[in-house]
Amino acid sequence: MAEFSPERRFTRIDRLPPYVFNITAELKMAARRRGEDIIDFSMGNPDGPTPPHIVEKLCTVAQRPDTHGYSTSRGIPRLRRAISRWYQDRYQVDIDPESEAIVTIGSKEGLAHLMLATLDHGDTVLVPNPSYPIHIYGAVIAGAQVRSVPLVEGVDFFNELERAIRESYPKPKMMILGFPSNPTAQCVELEFFEKVVALAKRYDVLVVHDLAYADIVYDGWKAPSIMQVPGARDVAVEFFTLSKSYNMAGWRIGFMVGNKTLVNALARIKSYHDYGTFTPLQVAAIAALEGDQQCVQDIAAQYKRRRDVLVKGLHEAGWMVEMPKASMYVWAKIPEPYAAMGSLEFAKKLLQDAKVCVSPGIGFGDYGDTHVRFALIENSDRIRQAVRGIKSMFRADGLLSSKNVAELPET
C-alpha cells in the first residue's frame, strides 16, 4: 500500500495565503505564557454576556426532547417569519419568509456557502480592499478570481467600483460589500446603495451585502439596508448576524434575505452540507429579534464609551486616529515615524513595547497595510492602560517628551 506523501499538495488550500492574524496571536500567547499582561484588541469577539432573556429561552427550549432532532436547511418557519417582521419594523421592507429568507450558521458560513453555490472557476468577483477575509477568500475557495476595489481614504469607492466593472474581462459576476465596514468602519448612506443597485442592473452583476454591524452605530447615525432600495431584490441579497447586536458570536446564527434565486441556491447547497442550526438556538434567535431591544442599545452604548476612551487617549498621545461612527473597530493609520515598518511589524512592536495586541491591516488586504485595527473588546480601564503603554512606547522612541504630549507627524 502506498504511503501518504507529506509533500502532496491540495490546490484549493494552496490558493489560501498564510493567515497573518495567527502570527500576532501566537506572539500574544507566548507573551502571556511569560506572565506579561497583554491588552487584546485583536479579534472582534464580543466580551459581554448574551442578554438573559435569550439565554433563558435557549435553556427552556433545549429541555424539550422534540427539539433535539435535525432542523431544516432553510431554518424553522417561525424564525423566518420573525426575520420578515424584523425587516418590516426596522426598514419598512416586506420580505417573503417562504422564498426570500434563509437562516444561516452565522454570516461566515452563509457567505462561504453562497459563493460556493453560485461561483464557477473563472468567474470574477469584486471585493473591497481592505475587507473582512471571508469576503475575499470565500470567492477564492469557490475557485473564482477576485478583483480588489480600493476602499481607502481619498478615493471615491463607488467610482472605483464602476470602473472595475467596466474594465474587467470577463465581466464580474458578483460584488461583495459590507457597510459599516470591517475593518475600516467606513459607512455609506442609502444613496450609495441606490447607485449600486442601478449599477448592478445595468451590468447584470449580483450584489451580496454583509450588514453585520447594523446596530453598532453611534451619535444618532443609522445604518441603511440595501433592501430599502426599490428593486434591490432583483439583484441583491443581504446577510445579518446576531453575533454583534446581541453578543451571540459563539452561538453561530444569522440569516440572509433578498433575491429568491440566490436564496434557493444557498438552500440547495446547505441541504447537502448541513441540516441547519440547533432548533433551540433558532427559537432563542426569535426571542432576540422580537424581544425588548434595549439590550441592543445598551451593547452599542458600551462600545461607544470604549470608542470615546480609546480615541481620546490616542489623540492625547499624538496618534490622530479617526473617530468611527459605527462598528466595533477603530481603524488607525500607522504614525509616520513607523509607517515604513508596515502593519505586521508595527503590530509586533506594539505587542512587544506597549503590551497591546492589534490586528495588522495587511490581514484584510494589501490596501490595509498602512493601518492597524483596534477591536473595542476591552473595558475602559484596560483601554486606558493600553494608552499608557502606547504613550510609553512613543516616549521611549523619542516621539513624546517626558512631560508634554506632542502630536506625532501626520502621514
How would you describe each model-predicted region?
Residues 1-9, 14-19, 26-39, 45-61, ...:
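PLP-dependent class I/II
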Residues 69-71, 297:
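Short, surface-exposed loop/turn segments at secondary-structure junctions
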Residues 75-82:
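Long amphipathic alpha-helix in the N-terminal Rossmann-like dinucleotide-binding domain
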